[in-house]
Curated annotation (Swiss-Prot):
NCBIfam families: rplM_bact. Belongs to the universal ribosomal protein uL13 family. Pfam families: Ribosomal_L13. The keyword Ribonucleoprotein applies. GO terms for molecular function: mRNA binding; structural constituent of ribosome. Keywords: Ribonucleoprotein, Ribosomal protein. It comes from Oleidesulfovibrio alaskensis (strain ATCC BAA-1058 / DSM 17464 / G20). Part of the 50S ribosomal subunit. This is Large ribosomal subunit protein uL13.
């Protein structure tokens, strides 16, 4: 029996909506990355992008444990001397709450062309409204 290798025309992608209210940031990101890669499907192959589309709403109400709000820092470097900028998680959640979840999921995906394609299937919104009603996303209850 030959090993099954999924073809691009055989891939079916579903749309799911996840409510991030009172969910822990890292645990939520791990489960989203698992679904974006397609590891929950029996036809998973590491060289094929066969994951689903994930729409995350209420990202501004995400939870973190411990002292991460003040201790966790995000760094950006402009490339110029003195251009290293740092923000705490509290500042990121106050200004752009979507970025905290996107950065967490991005760190759990492969760092190559395939990982960038997987990240494009993640749609994150701070409020409870999203513009993807036409795709009929199913509500997805994650484990924790």
């Amino acid at each position: 029996m030959k090993t099954f290798s999924p073809k691009p025309q055989d891939i079916t992608r579903d749309w799911y909506v996840v409510d991030a209210e009172d969910k822990i940031l890292g645990r939520l990101a791990a489960q989203i990355a698992h679904r974006l890669r397609g590891k929950h499907k029996p036809e998973f192959a590491p060289h094929v992008d066969n994951g689903d589309f994930i729409v995350v709403v209420n990202c501004e109400k995400i939870a973190v444990t411990g002292k991460k709000l003040s201790d966790k820092k995000y760094y950006r470097y402009s490339g110029y001397v003195g251009g290293l900028r740092e923000q705490t998680l509290a500042n990121v959640l106050a200004t752009k709450p979507e970025r905290a979840l996107i950065n967490a999921v991005k760190g759990m995906l492969p760092r190559n062309r395939l990982g960038r394609a997987m990240l494009k299937k993640l749609k994150v919104y701070a409020g409870s409204e999203h513009p993807h009603q036409a795709q009929n996303p199913q509500a997805l209850e994650l484990k924790y």
